[in-house]
Amino acid sequence: MPSFDIVSEIDMQEVRNAVENATRDLSTRWDFRNVPASFELNEKSQSIKVASESDFQVQQLVDILREKLVKRGIEGGALEIPEEMEHSGKTYSVEAKLKQGIETTLAKQLIKLIKDSKLKVQAQIQGEQVRVTGKARDDLQGVMALIRGGNLGQPFQFTNFRD
């Protein structure tokens, strides 16, 4: 019986490369000359700290970071940026979290979306991934298209496709 897994994973090496590219880009931009601005990747907490002198500059830095992440093959939805910025002294900063893994509530939404589509497939939660099985390969491809089209606020990948 054909099956595949729905996962949400981020390649941390690509994130590291994107942060390095953003830092390199920052050093060549004239609007950030003589401005203490930085990107800091914390791999343990899977977050990126963006800091600068003003909130407008922090927004520009976040846009640069998103652009570099997309160029490295990481979707922009994988970055969760809070609305409120931290302000301490002369520095504004924001701690952007990387979304990785499928939480239980999101997995339940995925399963509900699949069941509401009336396709002849079964979906089950397995840790931080969802396994989808069905009799026809076409039904599984329909589920893939459905998940790509559904805006669930997180990028998904399809792995372990078995026939």
From Swiss-Prot:
UniProt keywords (A-Z) are:
Nucleotide-binding
Q: Is-annotated flag, keyword tRNA-binding?
A: no
Show the NCBIfam families listed in the entry: PRK05412.1 (NF003819)
- Which cysteine residues pair off into disulfide bonds? none
According to UniProt, the name of this protein is Nucleotide-binding protein ECA1137
Instruction: List the GO terms this entry assigns under cellular component, sorted alphabetically.
Output: cytosol
| Coiled-coil residue spans | none
Q: Which GO terms describe its molecular function?
A: nucleotide binding
User: Which family does the record assign?
Assistant: Belongs to the YajQ family.
What is the stated purpose of this protein? Nucleotide-binding protein.
Taxonomically, the superkingdom here is Bacteria
Q: Name one Pfam family in it.
A: DUF520
